């Protein structure tokens, strides 16, 4: 089993852009992804390092339905034509937008690309008629994630403990994924 503390955050008014670097060779773009392409990017952004596993264990048809839903938008940061970030905005709840998945690959960590991506995310979310932009993160994620979301204008609203079968033991993720989290056989 693997346990994590999940923190839920929300933003109820648009936050202003925060300073982001001008990154040569990095371009924000829509992401057109089939299930395999999406899972590859999902793994590079979150599954390998941070134990993101929900979409890795989801049935292909269920994931395809989400990816093809007109109320779900996907975006990325392209570096030399290769997707190196994942931004998934979910507008399926009336009046709200969930920042469903957000992150950059190790190739962009520490470059300021996350700030650039968040500025785009916030603008895109609030272009729609919403009153709430929300996200959740957990203690399995990058140690700077919670602080980053707070600096981006999100406010914590609650926490929960989640316990799930360890995806490294069920075969969903490789044994070397999430090396910061011990495996308890």
Where would I find each of the regions flagged by the language model?
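Conserved GNAT acetyl-CoA-binding A-motif
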Residues: 125-137
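A conserved beta-strand-loop-helix scaffold within acyl/acetyltransferase catalytic domains
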Residues: 54-61, 67-106
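Short amphipathic alpha-helix that is part of the acyltransferase structural core
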Residues: 22-55, 175-176, 181
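Acidic/histidine-enriched, glycine/proline-rich intrinsically disordered or flexible terminal extensions
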Residues: 1-4, 163-185
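Conserved glycine-rich acetyl-CoA-binding loop
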Residues: 105-119, 128, 140-144, 151
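Acyl-donor-binding surface of acyltransferase catalytic domains
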Residues: 1-30
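Conserved beta-strand-loop-alpha-helix junction that forms the acyl-donor binding cleft
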Residues: 135-145, 162-168
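Conserved acetyl-CoA-binding loop of GNAT-fold acetyltransferases
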Residues: 126, 148-159
